[in-house]
Amino acid sequence: GGYASGPMLYAAQKSGIPTIIQEQNSYAGVTNKILGKRVKRVCVAYDGMERFFNPQAIVFTGNPVRPAIQNITCGLQESLDFFGLNAQSKIILVVGGSLGARTVNQSVAASVEKIAKAGVQVIWQTGKQYYEEAKHIAQAYPTIKVYDFIRQMDYAYTAADIIISRAGAGTISELCIVGKPCVFVPSPNVTEDHQTKNAQALVAKQAALLIPDADAKDTLFDVTLDLLQQPERMQLLATNIKALAIPNAAEKIVNEIVNILHT
């Protein structure tokens, strides 16, 4: 699905070749809405997708998640040692993706004194573009660990008590598997604001918190630090997001493809 594969799938449909699309988000894009009228299957990851597609074509598969996250084996102490953190203070993981998330980074930068005063540790993944500036800002705060990119996300997820992230479909699917309390700051720079809709779907199930991008610099860390003082609410969020995990999504999608090949 999506605009990149749209012409190929459209040509296949015109030629009578069976097609499948996977809609990863909670709000279907324009191309998938068009393609969805003639596909054999639509593999989805959110409830309510009959708003966009023929209900008979919809199969709830979830979104594939990389095996390293599905099968995390590292222990807590090993993860803490990797980042040079301790078990006595809570840990916030801030994830901006490989390119970084400007507003999220600005929110951390504006809150370093507040974070230090709260006695909280932070793993701050900035993206390459913001790394040097963030490293300079955090150099006076030894409990804030700055990385441009984290290859060992299994360690980061294991160490974290709360995770701050954008709300892309793949990221949300990973975080459902991880099952930690999450605060989402959806990117406003995406088609049809689909990240906000992704996050709202979790908020509606009490499975995450949502801070609009426009409010993040003022409120993100107030909300996050306040949440750290509410262990029962943290547990509720963790339990509810974990309940949304679909660890065998890739297998389900493959099964749908195989079934169509055999019909």
Question: Where do the language-model regions lie?
Answer:
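An aromatic- and histidine-rich active-site surface loop
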Residues: 1-15
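Donor-nucleotide binding loops and adjacent catalytic segments primarily
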Residues: 74-163, 195-199, 204, 211-220
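Short hydrophobic beta-strand element within catalytic cores of glycosyltransferases
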Residues: 165, 181-192
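C-terminal alpha-helical cap of glycosyltransferases
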Residues: 246-263
